[in-house]
Amino acid sequence: MGKSLVIVESPAKAKTINKYLGKDFIVKSSVGHVRDLPTAGQTATPTGKAAAASTKKASTTDKEQQKREKERAALIKKMGVDPYHGWQANYQILPGKEKVVAELQKLAKDADSVYLATDLDREGEAIAWHLREIIGGDEKRYKRVVFNEITKNAIQQAFKQPGELNMDGVNAQQARRFMDRVVGFMVSPLLWKKVARGLSAGRVQSVAVKLLVEREREIKAFVPEEFWDINADTLTADKQDFRLLVAQKDGLAFKPVNETEALAAVAALNKAQYEVCKREDKPTTSKPSAPFITSTLQQAASTRLGYGVKKTMMLAQRLYEAGYITYMRTDSTNLSAEAVENLRGYITKHYGEAYLPSQPNVYGSKQNAQEAHEAIRPSDVTVTADDLEGMEADAHKLYALIWNQFVACQMTPAQYDSTTVSVKAAEYTLKAKGRILKFDGWTRVQRPLGKNEDQILPPVKVGDSLKLVSLDPKQHFTKPPARYTEAALVKELEKRGIGRPSTYASIISTIQDRGYVKVDQRRFFAEKMGEIVTDRLDENFDDLMNYDFTARMEEKLDQIAEGEVNWTAVLDEFFADFSRDLETAEQDESLGGMKPNHIVMTNILCPTCSRPMGIRTASTGVFLGCSGYGLPPKERCKTTINLGDEEGVINVLEEDVETAALRAKKRCPICETAMDAYLIDDKRKLHVCGNNPNCEGFIVEEGEFKVKGYEGPTVECDKCGSDMVLKNGRFGKYMGCTNDACKNTRKILKNGEVAPPKEEPVHFPELPCENSDAYFVLRDGASGLFFAASNFPKSRETRAPLVEELKRFAERLPEKYQYLTSAPAHDPDGLPAVVRFSRKEKEHYVRTETEGKPSGWMAVYQEGKWLVTDKRKNAK
C-alpha cells in the first residue's frame, strides 16, 4: 500500500500537522494560492497597420462595431473571466508557483489518496478545488478534510471522516472574485478617462471608502458649539470631600451655553444651602462578553494592544498554524461542548466554585454566520501565554487576550453596589454617582474597558447638609463625530453586513493602498481624490455604492454557499444592472454620463501667462493649474503651483484637539463648511472649501506667512553642480535643484535613497513607430530601458529594444549600457533577442520571445561576459 499525500496552504501548518500523522502520509504545502485569474493581459494588441487593414472596406458603423468588439475581447482577455458567455474563466498558474505545482503533481501521481486539508472557509475550499483541478487524475482519489483547530485529536478525527469538496462554497468564492474583478477592470478605465489617470474602483472597497468620506464631510460640516459644566466641591459633616455635578435647574437638565449663563449659576450657587435630597443604593451586575469572533478580536486587539487589523490577522494565523488557537476567520460565537466542559473544570480548579455559573453561558451569533463552526479560543485552556514556544512577543500578547476572553466568557458576573446621591441647592440639583465592587467575577481574568465608575461616595443620608468649598465652572465645545479607526471601521462594516470575516483585513489594506484615504495616528482621513471618486461613483452607480445593496449581495453569496441559489444566475443579475449603469456612465455628461473632474477657478493669476489659475485635484493632491492648459498646443500653458499644507500637525488622540482645529479654520462663504488651508508662498495663503470641487468657495488670504526653512539632506545637481534639496510636490517627495534656471529633479526611491541621475533620451529617427508618425526614443525608467514614442504623451506607444538595434547604433548609447551591444542578438533558431529588465535583480538581461511569451532562451551578463541558458523544448 502506497502513501497518501496531504496538501495544506502553509509550511507552518504542514509542519504542525506532520507531527500528528503517521509515516503513511506525506504532508506538503501549496504556499497559498497556486492558480488565479491572469495578473495582466497576455496577448498583444494588433498593430495600427493590421487593424487598419482589417477595417479598410467596412462602413463607419461597422468600424465602430468592430472597434467595440475588439476592445471587449481585449478586456475579457485581461480580466480572465467572460461575463458575456457564461462566466468562463481563464485560470492560470501563478508566476513562481510552477515548481510547487510540478512537485505536487509528481507526488500525487504516486499517492494512493490525496487529502486536501486547506482552511475550512470559502477561500480554503477554493484553494482545494484549484489544487484538484491542476493536479488532475481520478477525482475519487481526492478527499477533503477540515478541522477547526490543529491539535492531535482534531486532526485524527478529521482524517477518520474525510468528506468531499464543497462546490457550493467554491462557487460562492468564485462569484465574489468575479464580481470584484468585473467592477475593478471595467470601472477603473472609466475613472481614468473621466476623472484622472491611475484611479481604481472596487465593489466592496469603494463602499468602505464612502463610509470614510461621509464621516470626513460630517466633521468638516460640524460647527462646534459652546457649553459649560459646573462642579461643586463640598464637605460632609465629618469633613469628607464630596464632588458633585450641577445637573438640573428647576427639574430640567441644565447645560449653560455661554459664560454669562455659567457665571449666573455660580453666583446663585455660592449663596445657596446644600442638602442631600435623595440617595439611591442598588445592586448591579456586569456580565462577561462573548468569546471573540474575527471582528471583535480585531477591535479588542486595536483598543487593548494597539495592533492594526493586518497585524492581528497575521499573528492569529501563526497561532492557529502552530496549533495554539482555533481558526481565526469566523463570525460564530459557538463553543464546542468539549471546550466548555474543559474550561468549566479549569475555572473550578483555579478560581473556585464562586466563579463558575450553574449553567454554561450561551451567546447568540448573527443569522447566517458564514463560518458557523466555533469562536476563536485557545486549543487547550491549560496552555497559557507563558507556555507558547517559537512565537514572538506580540503573538504572546494576542494569545493572552484570546485566552482571557475565552476564560472570562464562562465565568460569573461581576457584582457591584451602585449609588446615586442628589443634592438640592436653591433651584439647582447636583448629582454624584459611585460604584463599589463587591465580587470581581469575570473581571478577575479580563480587565473591563470603558469609563471607570468605581468610586466610593461618602456615607451621607437624606437631610444631611453639605458645606460648599468651591465651584469649578469649565468651558467646553461639542465634538465632531469621531474618526474611524481600523477597528471601528471593521465594526461599522460588520454592523451594516458589508464584507465577511475573511475579507475585513483585505478591505482595510486595499483602501489604504489605493491612496483614497490615509491613516494618521491610527485614525482615517479621507483624501480629496477619495471624495471626488466617491461622488462620481455614487452618482452613476447607485446600486454599487448602496450600503444595503452591498449587504444584500453578501447575503446572496451566503445563499450560494448554502446551495440555495445558482451562482451564475446571481452573477448574471448583477452584471445586467451593472453594465447598464456602466453604459450610461460612459456617455457625455449632458446625457447622464459621469461628470469630469471639475476645476474651480480663482482670481490668482498665472505667473507665466497671467491667465486665471484654477484649483485642480489629481490623484497626487490639490494644486493650482493655469486655465490656459486646455488651449491648442501652440498657445497652451502648463504652469502649475504646488500647494503646501499649512504648517501644524493635529494630534487627534488628544481630547478636543480636532474640535479646536475646526474652530480655527475659516468657514466657506458659500456653504459654511470648514476650509482647508494651503500656503502658495510666503505672501499668500489659499483657503479651499472642504467640499471642493462640489462647492467653488475659496478665499485668498494675503499677509506675511512663515515658510519653514530647509533642514534636510542635499546632493550635488548632476546638471549644473548646485545643491539639490528635498522638496514635497503633489507627486510626493523629490530632490529639486536650487538653481531656478536649472529645474533639474531626481526621484526619491521607496527605500529612501536618491535615484541615480536620469539619462537623457536617445533619439532613433531610423526606427518609426507603428501607430503614429513619430519615431522611437530610448528612455531609461524604473523598469529599465525601453523605446517610447518621440511625441509622448500624444502617442503612448512603447516596446522593448532589440539587441540588434542597439548594436546597429552602438555609438549613441551611454557608456553604462555599452555592454548590451556585446549580447547575443539571436537564439539558435534565429529569433531576435529582446532587452528586458529584472526588478528583482535590478539588472538587464536578454531573451527571445514567441507571441510575447519567453521562449526559454535567455542570457545574463556576469563578470564581464554573457552566460546563456537554453530551456526551450527543442533545444539541443
Curated annotation (Swiss-Prot):
Zinc fingers (C4-type): give the ranges. Answer: 668-695, 717-742
Residues marked Interaction with DNA (site): H33, R176, R177, D180, W192, R329, R514
The name under which this protein is listed is: DNA topoisomerase 1
Which PANTHER family does its entry note?
A: DNA TOPOISOMERASE (PTHR42785:SF1), DNA TOPOISOMERASE, TYPE IA, CORE (PTHR42785)
- Give EC number(s), comma-separated: 5.6.2.1
Q: Does the keyword Metal-binding apply?
A: yes
Q: Keywords on this record? A: DNA-binding, Isomerase, Magnesium, Metal-binding, Repeat, Topoisomerase, Zinc, Zinc-finger
Q: Which domain of life is it from?
A: Bacteria
- List the Gene3D superfamilies: 2.20.25.10, 3.40.50.140, Bacterial Topoisomerase I, domain 1, Topoisomerase I, domain 2, Topoisomerase I, domain 3, Topoisomerase I, domain 4
Q: Function, please?
A: Releases the supercoiling and torsional tension of DNA, which is introduced during the DNA replication and transcription, by transiently cleaving and rejoining one strand of the DNA duplex. Introduces a single-strand break via transesterification at a target site in duplex DNA. The scissile phosphodiester is attacked by the catalytic tyrosine of the enzyme, resulting in the formation of a DNA-(5'-phosphotyrosyl)-enzyme intermediate and the expulsion of a 3'-OH DNA strand. The free DNA strand then undergoes passage around the unbroken strand, thus removing DNA supercoils.
